[in-house]
Regions:
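Conserved nucleotide-sugar phosphate-binding/catalytic loop shared by glycosyltransferases and other
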Residues: 33-84
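Short gly/pro/ser/thr-enriched loop/turn and capping motifs at secondary-structure boundaries
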Residues: 41-42, 58-62, 142-148, 152, ...
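Nucleotide-activated sugar donor-binding and catalytic core shared by glycosyltransferases
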Residues: 2-10, 17-33, 39, 43-50, ...
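Short, polar loop motifs at secondary-structure junctions
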Residues: 36-41, 119-123, 231-235, 310-315
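Conserved nucleotide-sugar donor-interacting segment of glycosyltransferase catalytic cores
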Residues: 92-173, 221-222, 226, 232-235
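Conserved nucleotide-sugar donor-binding subdomain of glycosyltransferases
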Residues: 68-124, 176-218
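Conserved catalytic-core segment of nucleotide-activated headgroup transferases in glycan assembly
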Residues: 237-314
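Donor nucleotide-sugar binding/catalytic pocket of nucleotide-sugar-dependent glycosyltransferases
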Residues: 212-214, 221-235, 242-253
């Protein structure tokens, strides 16, 4: 039995996709800890994992709720700092620089054999590797380096085989790099520079750190391999896959401990539409208007029915003229609802999209920010659904899009075919096999 520590970027969209893998490791007899902020402790323990506190004094329980309020009520630089988790990263870089820091001490005290750290937590990976611990980078995002005719994941460009597509992808990478520089200036923090300094501080080569469309990443290598929790079938074609990068299963947790959904108000004979903008719907400025647009669309379609998950910030009473065929909830279990869903309206979070594919549900995607435009583009590329603008779509246009996806059998056929690949990979569990091959028989760590 090995002791394994998982730590994910402090958002539900990163944490939840790791649960299936964590449970699979537990089922193999390993002891699995999660290193996380206090706000996630209860949810982590509910899934059956051990918990290690992370920055308990600086980010006590209740921090996430306070941050939600700040995000909803700020603009400009303050907004960018919050959604970029700048305060968290400042604390992380400061802590891992310290030789005898509490994170390192916790890892050594429990006899950690292997660390599975989010690709967005590269500072942790560098610290743990320097301490002699085995590390695997765990990516729920497709945050891969630049390649020919491979647009950055922050854009909604859908590539094709034309010379113009090659040029467009190259220009998009240039603009993406410029956008990162501007963001760094606005928030007053250069993540690429800080991560490079940290790498050299720990004795690694400066070129270990490379730019990417989202967060600067560690160059793929066999010393710190990267598991991408997304099947390669969903990605755009790449000229080659770099050594040390492994596309794996979608890692869909079908056994999350959540309240059972009440189906008494749902008519099994009507098409069911499920709408969610994820756990952080409040960070998208058009989200309130968008939710109302979806509700207005349903008012003219009594032959359809809708379940809408509003997220933690919005309340049902804030929306007007809600018809009887609409249920408004703050949170709903995707895994319980998707098997009965005809079409999903989503913000394009990679976790939600993977779940839709797994359950053969075509999509209408309205990407918010970060990497969501890139996943929406992949949905269009593979003909799994349609893409629209969250801030511009009208009720009439949305009805047309939903009609097209529901009535055109090609979308259902394409998503079902990819769903078969997803389920086959889930059963094969290549990530689990790769992780177990990395577990050391003997372990020597720096004190």
């Amino acid at each position: 039995m090995a002791t394994i520590v998982i730590s994910m970027f402090p958002e539900e969209g990163h944490l939840i996709p790791s649960f299936k893998l964590g449970k699979s490791l537990k089922a193999q007899g390993h002891q699995v800890y999660y290193l996380a902020l206090a706000d996630f402790e209860e949810y982590i323990r509910k899934q059956g994992f051990e918990y290690l506190p992370l920055f308990a004094e600086d980010f006590p329980k209740g921090f996430r709720a306070q941050q939600t309020e700040r995000i909803a009520n700020t603009r400009g630089r303050a907004f960018l700092k919050e959604v970029s988790q700048t305060a968290f990263y400042l604390k992380l870089f400061q802590t891992v620089h310290e030789d005898q820091n509490p994170i390192k001490r916790s890892l050594l005290e429990i006899g950690t054999d292997l660390c599975l750290f989010d690709g967005f937590l590269a500072p942790l990976s560098l610290m743990a590797r320097h301490a002699g611990l085995e590390v695997i980078s765990l990516s729920i995002n497709i945050n891969l380096p630049q390649a020919a005719n491979y647009p950055p994941v922050v854009t909604n460009i859908v590539p094709d085989n034309t010379p113009a597509s090659l040029s467009k992808a190259g220009m998009a990478w240039k603009f993406s790099g410029l956008a990162i520089k501007i963001t760094n200036l606005l928030i007053g923090y250069n993540f690429q520079k800080k991560l490079t300094e940290l790498a050299t501080h720990f004795g690694f080569s400066a070129d270990l750190v490379v730019p990417a469309a989202l967060f600067p990443r560690l160059r793929p290598q066999l010393e710190i391999p990267e598991l991408v929790l997304c099947p390669q079938a969903f990605d755009f074609p790449r000229p080659s896959v770099e050594q040390g990068i492994f596309y794996c299963e979608p890692s869909i947790d079908l056994d999350r401990q959540e309240a059972a959904f009440d189906w008494s108000q749902i008519d099994p004979n009507k098409p069911l539409i499920f709408c969610t903008l994820g756990s952080q719907s409040h960070i998208y400025k058009p989200s309130r208007r968008f939710f109302q647009t979806v509700i207005d669309t349903m008012r003219s379609r009594p032959d359809w029915q809708l379940i809408m998950a509003l997220g933690q910030k919005f309340q049902a009473h804030e929306f007007a003229n809600v018809p009887a065929n609409v249920q408004l909830l703050q949170w709903a279990s995707v895994e319980q609802i998707l098997p009965r869903t005809s079409v999903m309206i989503t913000h394009g979070g990679v976790g939600t999209i993977k779940e839709c594919v797994y359950f053969n549900v075509p999509m209408v995607v309205f990407p918010g920010n970060r990497d969501q435009p890139g996943y929406a583009a992949r949905v269009v590329y593979h003909e799994l659904g349609l893409m629209g603008s969250m801030g511009k779509v009208s009720a009439q246009a949305l009805e047309t899009m939903l009609n097209q996806v529901i009535q055109n059998p090609n979308f259902k056929q394409r998503v079902t075919a990819m769903g078969e690949e997803f389920r086959a990979l889930e059963a094969a569990s290549p990530a689990l096999e790769l992780i177990q091959s990395k577990l050391p028989h003997t372990r020597t760590v720096a004190s």
